[in-house]
Amino acid sequence: MRTAYRIKPRFGARAWWAIVGVAVILLGAPAVINAAVPDAAPVMSRVELGSEDYGWTVGMRDRDGSELVCEQHFDDPMTERWTCGQTEIRTTVVENAEDQDLALRRIIRGVGVGWRVLDQNVPLRHRAEARQIEDTAADATAISLEGSGEHRDQTIMVVVSGPDRMKYSDLVWHNVTSGGRS
């Protein structure tokens, strides 16, 4: 003779509702706390191309010589990021880039503007150790500055995207190719 043995739960509806209530409290508490805590004030700081971690930065100055100050974001450990109005400036330093032109083409994808392949026929603008390329489909401009001296194997990479991309990419180009460099 076979007997089927089943363990029946020892608690009823009240216990189930208690478990559901605890789950709602645990899952809902972060949302309530987030709503109660005010948003942090934006951090305004001077835009500096490059990276202090590598000991190489180029301070951005406006055409009138004043420091360019924008809202800085700290959400990406690989790049420094500022928002100037609705335009974004991202910068990083890469090491040992053997093909500077290819590195510049790749950086547009690398900082999150898009994963599409940039047309190889898009011309690059060169001036001494600086390069610039525009990706109009992604509304982005990438600019690089190849290092020399103690920064010989380093390259500052900058990607500018957004509605005022041309204004800020021209400003970056001016700073990396002229006396704006520090």
Residue ranges of each PLM-predicted region?
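Conserved polar/disulfide-associated segments of primarily extracytoplasmic proteins
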Residues: 3, 38-44, 70-155, 161-182
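Compositionally biased, intrinsically disordered low-complexity regions enriched in proline and serine
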Residues: 6, 55-57, 169
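Hydrophobic membrane-insertion alpha-helices, especially the h-region
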Residues: 6-36
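Intrinsically disordered regions, especially transient/low-confidence alpha-helical propensity segments
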Residues: 13-14, 53, 63-65, 79, ...
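Polar low-complexity intrinsically disordered regions enriched in Ser/Thr and small residues
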Residues: 15, 24, 31, 53, ...
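A generic structural signal for solvent-exposed, polar alpha-helical segments
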Residues: 22-23, 62, 121
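C-terminal region of N-terminal signal peptides and the immediate post-cleavage residues
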Residues: 26-56
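Proline-anchored loop/turn motifs at beta-strand termini and strand-loop-strand connectors
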Residues: 53-74
